[in-house]
Amino acid sequence: MPSDFTPIFIPGLILTADLFAPQLVGLRTPLPPRVANTLAHDSLTDMAEEALALVDGPVLPMGLSMGGYVAMEMARLAPERLVGIALLNTAHKADDAARREQRMATIKMAQSDRFRGVTRHLLKSFLSPAALGDESIVARVMAMAATVGRENFVLQQHAILGRRDQTDTLRSLQVPGLVLCGSLDTLTPPARSHEMAALLPHSRLLILDQIGHLSSLEAPQAVTDALNALIDDI
């Protein structure tokens, strides 16, 4: 494996680079990490193409939630560019009918000038009960959501609605992988991570106890350590 690869962090829905602030300073890599742009796109493919264009040469996509969808799309588009992949609190299959209805409802709510209410609603599924009681984490998520804004939130939701099943992508990926999830994640439950780890030929599965959907904020050191362990395997 090449030693000059670039890690690319990919934020989730309604989130920014601050999602990975602890990991951006704690990652041990030969080249500085980059953060993909997930704004102003209504297509995961467009997000993935822009992320791949950030640098020349090998890359290590590391995505959380929607960022994981983008990471898998990067793997589908350019598997030869990847030296590894980190899939945090994410899923490889498209939404079922019930989840699609929920997603459409949040789009309508955001479009009706109730965007801040959407953010407050999402907090309950983003964070574990303990993290919901941590004012600093809640404030951080709310600040990221305000930065992303209503228009980008709607675009991102449409991008997610259009995502494909990445079963074949994962099954054919011949690079080291990390699949990580929180035990209290209700948006992408641990069962999804078990499925992805079973598909990836060279993967490590890590379920963080008592952690919710935003693992990089709730368990920053554990996530950083897991990412560094993946890098050591490359």
Q: Model segments located where?
A:
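Conserved HGGG/HGGXW glycine-rich cap/lid loop of the alpha/beta-hydrolase fold
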Residues: 1-45, 49, 64
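Conserved alpha/beta-hydrolase catalytic His-Asp/Glu region
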Residues: 95-98, 113-171
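Short alpha-helix in the alpha/beta-hydrolase fold that links the catalytic acid
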Residues: 175, 189-198
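Flexible "cap/lid" loop of the alpha/beta hydrolase fold
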Residues: 76-77, 81-120
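Gly/Ala-rich beta-loop-alpha elbow adjacent to hydrolase catalytic centers
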Residues: 63-67, 71
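Short beta-strand/loop motif that positions the catalytic acidic residue
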Residues: 173, 179-181, 185
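Catalytic histidine-centered segment of alpha/beta-hydrolase-like enzymes
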Residues: 211-224
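Catalytic histidine neighborhood in serine/cysteine hydrolases
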Residues: 194-213
